[in-house]
Swiss-Prot record:
GO terms for molecular function: DNA binding; DNA-directed RNA polymerase activity; magnesium ion binding; zinc ion binding. This is DNA-directed RNA polymerase subunit beta'. It comes from Chlamydia trachomatis serovar D (strain ATCC VR-885 / DSM 19411 / UW-3/Cx). Mg(2+) binds at D463, D465, D467. The keyword Zinc applies. Signal peptide: none annotated. DNA-dependent RNA polymerase catalyzes the transcription of DNA into RNA using the four ribonucleoside triphosphates as substrates. Its cofactor is Mg(2+); Zn(2+). Zn(2+) 1 binds at C72, C74, C87, C90.
Length: 1396
């Protein structure tokens, strides 16, 4: 555990010279002889008059050391010269008072006491060793019943429980000496001591081998694991019962006198006093031969007092202190946010730091921050003192401090000198990702606020409405070097989560640049409107300066003449640039003076998105230094131009569209029609609600677009400030513009449901009282959401960090041949995420060729794809690419650089020791918080998305693939299944069957793909030609229809009124509707179709789910395509990350979703087999092998497959979300990984948040680190045990080498919380959650923590094994190993010489 040497363990621990930590159970001997410096016999603490500790009490100086440095209790010895002397009068050693922080004592107990952790923490360790239930043990420990320890020659059984009456009866029958039965801790101690663990282990293994029941095997395996832990460690089971209690050093449980004769004390002192009082009383009682019943009660009270000391409230009612508050026990000291681990070890307050309000510093360079002089003086004080002493200005520290307080002129000179090249760290809470702490060169400023460069605000998520930031000074040379090289703001201009620039101009800067780069404006002839020509940029700039740089739209005739003087910045001009004549504007020429030449002449308008692209392009072409200079220039230019342009918004700039009245009237008419349909009973109330909302959503979009185009139109002649702000991306968006000038639109209730009647007024017109009241609903929801969800998001980040903290880059290349396959992500025909974005920066696992040309290699196996290569692959039309991934990485610890790919923060291959796990966790957690905070910005506006029709984007041939359709009476094709799609293909003159064959084998690519829902109406026939803009299909948004595909007569089956159906009179329409209701029993509601009215020949049956409304009558004659019933879809709720965050948590915690979908277990064809116990029996039959898999599906679930449908393994059979564990079981690890990554990404994509796949992959990798043993073979592993893959393969390798049978296991999916607790490091797990359980578990099996992860090293005060500490750790490990080898060698040679 420690480096070998002559010094004692404590000294080594102090110096941190250890590389592993072992935990175990302390024996009584250890507590009494090794830890303790004396026994505490009195409950007294300090004398209330003298405030001096009482002798032999809880603060005794003789035991714990002096309260004053170098001074004994009685005052005989004072000063350091008596160091080490033990006073002959008071017995106190003369030493430093700080020993009172480390010296412990003990209390000798009158009777053995059971340690509550080992008995009450589930699973009960004592119960498992003895094979007794926790309730039986409890009765013994708390002196309610006797337990037989030695049955002797009686008919009793060992460990049998006897109550008082039974005990007396047995004593009468056999005599008191014929057997041994005891109560309390003593009994448990004797039982544990007499337990033969070796033979128990053999017996358990034998029983495990013979048992067939899965449940019993799991139980036995758990018990076996605990027993094995004791056998393999140096722990003895009887040590779980205490005879001595250790007492914590007094300075860790202080007692502080307050004014007025009262004391503030740690709760531990009260708890210790209770134990001592009861213990002393019990000792006295035992000496006096008191009646058994009193003794027993006193022993029980002592057990309870010790329980309260270790874990108050774990057994019975907690012990209360003053003010009826439960006292904080030793367990509470460790647990939770304010426990020792999280409060003092993982997060400490640091010296050399300060905080202040921040203000904007537009004059600063990118790598600078403004530091108030007073603050700098305080922070750099020791540096100043050293410099002043070196200069000879002062000779003592005291005089230097006085000089600093005086503010002498030379102090300021020294300060200026010191801060040059000494970076400081700025941090803004909450630090959600690594960009929350960055280093800057300080610039001394007057005032008291810290100045921050405007471009770093986005990374810190800072604004200047009162935000504060903390400043930290890196002290050591190494820390300063790290801050300079790795943490400077210019090195952090890209997001580690997506690789996009984070330092981009925003707000005013964007507006200024956009205005400068605006499209050319046409000036009439009378203002000299001829297009002027210039020979070069210099001439343009000269002309601009001559005219005083006119920026207003009002054009002064006097300023313009034929010589071209006083040109306008938006005027169209011709200029020769690089030998070419370009049509541009003076503004653009001026902007290009700051653009690096390598980027070429920028001749287009510059909204924020394009600026961002330009920065990325600049970094790739000219490197970091030039990019940072360019960013500073952009900032400067942006602010100057927006100030000069003086763009401000007036009320009249908000134009109300003229067609508003017309559109609203039309909408009200449509709503009236829908209402009439409802009253006539054609549609349900749910459908009416959904249709109404669809109408208003459409109106909202129409008006929004009308308003936007009106403002845009006006901008062509004169800049509309509102349009400038929105189009440039400086402030606001279309949705907010819509509320200002069109209508506020639909509002949401706090529960997410949409209020039907929209707010038709806008802010320019003003809201009515009713509208204002409806508005307040959504606004308040936004505020409440923010408060609640921020906490949720922070907790999610914490769990993610904990699960991924030890994923570091440990090697360059693991050499794996495994890969994953990625392709473009599409939604319908829309491309959501192109292939190039998914493969950029990833390692290719096999050569990629130009399609149809094997000689042209686009990328070789092992290449890390550059953006140019990724672009080429995408342009070549390649569908999917095989890439290496952290999911398939085979590194023994952490992951390798090749499987991870590029570091997105700098575009280079990731370096060794990089903490990619923590980066991944922050990348996923940070936007969660951002988005939850962002909900209220829309003021609760219902943001729903609806697309009721599909329109062809280009000309082509329409091909149905995997679609079952029926032609209705109007000649339209109605879709009967859910799995198919419409494909638009290039017209190449082939036959329809050829197209279908080529599409199904993926031999040709479709121009567009449209997945179609059940019940969609296709308006174009299969194989027909379509033109761009033609309507192809209409989608049913409000209902899931059940459509008949054959003609015939209707017959109701199992549609029994009052049992499976009910007639409901619609309150509003008065019409009676037949609805299928949820029911219990053997009924299987369905509609059968017969060929004739006599019901002789059955044509088909249709299962009707509960909640469906039946649309046909018994005996009615129907034609194909007619609606039999319809199941209304749930009312539309707004899409919001509020729904999204819990979804991410549900995925990463691997929880089973509510109303989960059933999925097919094998490939085959669907059939039904009736009903059993209120469940529908659905069978999937493999037609080749004849194999069948039965699915019992609740009648309340809605099936999305029908009889005769072909399904593939893992395909959904019912509506709902899929259970991830089922995907793992049925489809395997690869499919599950793909599912989890895509599902998490979908939540973020919906909010427009860009996170690279590799981050999600790391989290998913950590969730799949373990396997569950199904057959232990000859290994030491246990049945049902979850072990690390690494450990499993190692154990199997060892067993196979020894000629044994290897173990079998299946992969297991763990949620992130469970995975964190299952980590190898017990220190890391204990600091996360379930502290007592983790520590108990670790102590029982004497676990060793090798300090490999980050958290455990931070807790132990070591350098972390990542980043710059990665190499250091490696070197130390090698050095220690070498030292140990030398030691062994020396020992051997010594041994030989002695033997010789």
């Amino acid at each position: 555990m420690f480096r070998e040497g002559s010094r004692d363990d404590a000294a080594l621990v102090k110096e941190g010279l250890f590389d592993k930590l072992e935990i175990g159970i302390a024996s009584d001997v250890t507590i009494r002889d090794k830890w303790s410096c004396g026994e505490i016999k009195k409950p007294e603490t300090i004398n209330y008059r003298t405030f001096k500790p009482e002798k032999g009490g809880l603060f005794c100086e003789k035991i714990f050391g002096p309260t004053k440095d170098w001074e004994c209790y009685c005052g005989k010895y004072k000063k350091i010269k008596h160091k080490g002397i033990v006073c002959d009068r008071c017995g106190v050693e003369v030493t430093l008072s700080k020993v009172r922080r480390e010296r412990m004592a003990h209390i000798e107990l009158a009777v053995p006491i059971v340690h509550i952790w080992f008995f009450k923490t589930t699973p009960s360790r004592i119960g498992n060793v003895l094979g007794m239930t926790a309730s039986d043990l409890e009765r013994v420990i708390y002196y309610e019943e006797y337990v037989v320890i030695d049955p002797g020659n009686t008919d009793l059984v060992k460990k049998q429980l006897l109550n008082d009456a039974k005990y007396r009866e047995v004593v009468e029958k056999w005599g008191k000496d014929a057997f041994v039965a005891k109560m309390g801790g003593e009994a448990v101690y004797d039982l544990l001591k007499s337990e033969d663990l070796e033979s128990l282990l053999g017996e358990l293994k034998e029983r495990l081998r013979k048992t067939k029941s899965q449940q019993a095997r799991m139980k036995l395996a758990k018990r076996l694991k605990i027993v094995e832990g004791f056998v393999s460690s140096s722990n003895r089971p009887e040590w779980m019962v205490l005879k001595n209690i250790p007492v914590v050093p007094p300075d860790l449980r202080p007692l502080v006198p307050l004014d007025g004769g009262r004391f503030a004390t740690s709760d531990l002192n009260d708890l210790y006093r209770r134990v001592i009082n009861r213990n002393n009383r019990l000792k006295a009682i035992l000496r006096l031969k008191t009646p058994e019943v009193i003794v027993r009660n006193e022993k029980r009270m002592l057990q309870e007092a010790v329980d309260a000391l270790f874990d108050n409230g774990r057994h019975g009612h907690p012990v209360m202190g003053a003010g009826n508050r439960p006292l904080k026990s030793l367990s509470e000291m460790l647990k939770g946010k304010n426990g020792r681990f999280r409060q003092n070890l993982l997060g400490k307050r640091v010296d050399y730091s300060g905080r202040s309000v921040i203000i904007v510093g537009p004059e600063l360079k990118f790598n600078q921050c403004g530091l108030p002089k007073e603050m700098a003086l305080e922070l750099f004080e020791p540096f100043i003192i050293k410099r002043l002493k070196d200069q000879g200005s002062v000779y003592t520290i005291r005089s230097a401090k006085k000089m600093i307080q005086r503010g002498a002129p030379e102090v300021w000179d020294v300060l200026e000198e010191i801060i040059k090249g000494h970076p400081v760290l700025l941090n803004r809470a909450p630090t959600l990702h690594r960009l929350g702490i960055q280093a800057f060169e300080p610039v001394l400023i007057e005032g008291k606020a810290i100045r921050v460069h405007p471009l770093v605000c986005a990374a810190f998520n800072a604004d200047f409405d009162g935000d504060q930031m903390a400043v930290h000074v890196p002290l050591s040379i190494e820390a300063q070097l790290e801050a300079k090289v790795l943490m400077m703001a210019p090195d952090n201009i890209f997001l580690p989560s997506s690789g996009k620039p984070v330092a981009t101009p925003s707000k005013d800067m964007t507006l200024g640049i956009y205005y400068l780069m605006a499209d050319p404006t046409y000036f009439p002839e009378e203002h000299g409107g001829k297009t002027k020509a210039f020979k070069d940029e210099v001439e343009v700039l000269r002309a601009l300066n001559a005219g005083g740089f006119i920026l207003k739209d009002e054009i002064c005739g006097s300023r313009r003449d034929e010589t071209g003087r006083g040109i306008h910045i938006h005027e169209k001009i011709k200029v020769r640039i690089d030998g070419q004549i370009i049509e541009t504007t003076p503004g653009r020429v001026f902007f290009n003076t700051i653009v690096p030449k390598e980027l070429g002449f920028q001749n287009y308008s510059m909204p924020s998105k394009r600026i961002s692209e330009l920065i990325l392009q600049c970094y790739k072409k000219v490197g970091l230094e030039a990019t940072v200079r360019f960013l500073d220039d952009l900032k400067e230019l942006g602010f100057v131009q927006s100030t000069k342009a003086a763009i401000s918004m007036g009320l009249k700039d908000v134009k109300i569209p003229e067609i508003k009245k017309e559109i609203l009237k039309d909408a009200y008419d449509k709503v009236a029609v829908v209402k009439k349909q409802y009253e006539d009973g054609i549609i349900t109330d749910g459908e009416r609600h959904s249709k109404t909302i669809s109408i208003w959503t459409e109106v909202s979009d129409l008006l929004s677009n009308a308003l936007y185009s009106e403002i845009k139109k006006q901008t062509n002649s004169k800049h509309n400030p509102l349009f400038l702000m929105i189009d440039s991306g400086a402030r606001g968006n279309k949705s907010q513009l819509k509320q200002l000038g069109a209508l506020r639109g639909l509002m949401a209730k706090p529960n997410g449901a949409i209020i039907e009647s929209p707010i038709t007024s806008n802010f320019r017109e003003g809201l009515t009282v009713l509208e204002y009241s409806i508005s307040s609903h959504g606004a308040r929801k936004g505020l409440a959401d923010t408060a609640l969800k921020t906490a949720d998001s922070g907790y999610l980040t914490r769990r993610l960090v904990d699960v991924a903290q030890d994923v570091i880059i440990t090697e360059r290349d693991c050499g794996t041949l495994n890969h994953i396959e990625v392709s473009t992500i599409r939604q319908g025909s829309e491309e959501l995420l192109p292939l190039k974005d998914r493969v950029y920066g990833r390692t290719v696992s096999e050569n990629i060729y130009q399609p149809g040309d094997k000689s042209n290699v686009l990328a070789y196996a092992g290449d890390v794809l550059t953006s140019a290569q990724a672009e080429a692959i995408d342009d070549a039309g390649i569908e999917s690419v095989k890439i290496r991934s952290t999911l398939t990485c085979e590194s023994r610890r952490g992951v390798c650089a090749k499987c991870y790919g590029l570091n997105l923060a700098n575009g280079r291959l990731i370096g060794l020791g990089e903490a990619v796990g923590i980066i991944a966790a922050q990348s996923i957690g940070e936007p969660g918080t951002q988005l939850t905070m962002r909900t209220f910005h829309l003021g609760g506006i219902a943001a729903t998305s609806s697309t009721p029709e599909i329109v062809a984007e280009c000309d082509g041939i329409l091909v149905y693939l995997d679609l079952r359709v029926v032609v209705d009476q109007e000649g339209n094709n109605l879709v009967l299944n859910k799995m198919g799609a419409l494909h638009l293909v290039q017209d190449e003159g082939r036959s329809l069957s050829e197209y279908k064959k080529l599409l199904s084998t993926k031999s040709i690519e479709s121009l567009a793909t449209f997945p179609v829902e059940l019940g969609a109406k296709i308006l174009v026939n299969d194989g027909a030609a379509v033109a761009a803009g033609q309507r192809i299909a209409e989608v049913e948004l409000h209902n899931i229809p059940i459509i008949c595909d054959k003609p015939g007569f209707v017959h109701y089956e199992d549609l029994v009124e009052g049992v499976s159906t009910e007639k409901v009179t619609n309150k509003n329409t008065g019409l009676v509707e037949l609805i299928v209701k949820q029911h219990r029993g053997e009924l299987h509601p369905q509609i059968a179709i017969y060929a004739d009215a006599n019901m002789k020949e059955l044509v088909g049956t249709y299962a009707i789910p509960s909640g469906a409304i039946i649309s046909v009558e018994e005996g009615q004659r129907i034609a194909p395509g007619m609606l039999l019933a319809r199941l209304p879809r749930g009312a539309i709720k707004t899409k919001d990350i509020t729904g999204g965050l819990p979804r991410v948590a549900e995925l990463v915690e691997a929880r089973k979703p509510e109303d989960a979908a059933d999925i097919a277990k094998i490939d085959g064809v669907v059939d039904f087999k009736g009903i059993q116990k209120n469940k529908r029996i659905l069978v999937v039959r493999d037609e080749i092998t004849g194999m069948e898999e039965e699915h019992l599906i609740s009648l309340t679930k809605h099936l999305i497959v029908q009889r005769g449908d072909s399904v593939i393994k893992g395909q959904q059979l019912t509506d709902g979300l899929v259970v991830p564990h089922e995907i793992l079981e049925i489809c395997g690890v690869r499919e599950l990984q793909k599912y989890l990554v895509n599902e998490v990404q979908e939540v973020y994509r919906l909010q427009g948040v860009d996170i690279n796949d590799k981050h999600v992959e790391i989290i998913v990798r950590q969730m799949l680190q373990k396997v569950r043993i199904t057959d232990p073979g000859d290994t030491t592993l246990l049945f049902g045990e979850d072990v690390d893959k690494k450990e499993f393969y190692e154990e199997n390798r060892r067993t196979e080498e020894d000629g044994g049978k290897p173990a079998q296991a299946v992969p297991v999916l763990l949620g992130i919380t469970k995975a964190s607790l299952g980590t190898e490091s017990f220190i890391s797990a204990a600091s996360f959650q379930d502290t007592t359980r983790v520590l108990t578990d670790a102590a029982c099996s004497s676990k060793t923590d090798y300090l490999l992860g980050f958290k455990e090293n931070v807790i132990m005060g070591h350098m972390i094994p990542g980043g710059t500490g990665f190499d250091t750790h490696k070197r130390i490990k090698q050095h220690l190993e070498k030292e140990q080898e030398d030691l062994v060698f020396d020992f051997d040679s010594e041994f030989e010489s002695v033997a010789g």
